[in-house]
Amino acid sequence: ARAVSRRGAEGLMQLMPATAADLDVQDSFDPRDNIDGGVRHLKRLMARFHNNVPLALAAYNAGEQAVINYRGIPPYRETRQYVVRVLRRYDREAARLVAQQLAAPKSSTPKIVRVSYAGGRAVTAPVMPALTLAEGGKGAQPDKKKSESP
């Protein structure tokens, strides 16, 4: 399926064509190319907004210029709902990682890091190995080469 939003954003990461071109995404409908571009775009927005996750998310959804013009999250209903949904999911995933490590055998004591986002609650979570898709796309496996500190 070729995912296209009503505003023209394309692919899994819903990149606008101009953004995809700026990121040198050759095919917005190729999952690898689209996800790579989307991740680079989000990383760039995180740097632009000084690691302020809500602002970076708002810029990803509404556009960087809208966040700059409004000096914060724009008053667009869709954007505000998007930021809230993503941050709630972020909180759930951080809590899941903590619970997973608390249930792990004591012999596998992880390093502890602080997971937070600007303006929000912080939780303590373990460093988890980076995950890569297993051969054949049948799940995720730890990537031992990309493990350890964030």
List PLM regions with ranges:
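Cell-wall glycan-active module
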Residues: 88-150
